[in-house]
Amino acid sequence: MAATAEPESTAKRGTGGRPTREEAARREARIVEVATRLFIERGFDGTSIDAVAEAAGVSKPTLYSRYQDKRALFEAVLQDRIREWLAPLSAAAEMQALRATPKDAATVLDELSRNLLVRAQAPETTALTRCITAQALQFPDLARLAYEEGWLRGVRTVGRLLGAMAEQGQITIDDPEIAADLFLNLVMGRSSKQALYGIEVDVEVQEKRRRAAVALFLAGVRPNPA
């Protein structure tokens, strides 16, 4: 989490009294951090722009100059969570493609599956997913954003990873994105639904399912021996 921002009156200012780029970025991060917490604690309907401004220590005109309404603020929170979700997927894909001696597919997918479950079941992720679900009919564009920029970009990113493995001869797949979609659903399906519905996850059962999901996927994509 970002550190508590300085009040606007004491923040360092650039030429002409305007916030420096660094200070503006810190303030932006603080606003998104506070908004995330309030949306999680109070839900979409229970959170107001005024409450976010007060908790973040910024003036209402400052907040409204950046976000015209609550929907725009929620979109910023959603984009922030999407970046966190995509970061480890992108890193895994890039590392696999750039390695002179690629890591074994089983090792990479085992590590990735662990990371996926941790992030997918984080309280912040689960709570925001509930908010999106509750507001899907009222704000269908936000639901589409979560699906297209979150899930589908995740699928494409894992698809790049699997594509690199295929080029290295470690696996055989016809369509990397279809394979990625199947992998993500195998690994995350049951556990993410339990977290979404507030059902306690049995850690031992989840770990058993995770290992089985990776093994089942690999069994279907390993090249046939000559």
Where are the language model's segments positioned?
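Hydrophobic alpha-helical connector segments
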Residues: 89-126, 180
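N-terminal intrinsically disordered/low-complexity leader segments
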Residues: 1-26, 92-96, 224-226
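Amphipathic alpha-helical packing segments from all-alpha helical-bundle domains
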Residues: 107, 118-133, 140-167, 208
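C-terminal alpha-helix
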Residues: 161, 216-224
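Generic hydrophobic, amphipathic alpha-helix propensity
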Residues: 26-35, 52, 77-81, 85, ...
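Short hydrophobic clusters on alpha-helical segments that form packing/core surfaces
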Residues: 31-39, 116, 217
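Helix-turn-helix
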Residues: 30, 38-72, 76-77
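Hydrophobic/aromatic-rich alpha-helical bundle segments in the mid-to-C-terminal region
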Residues: 144, 152, 166-215, 225
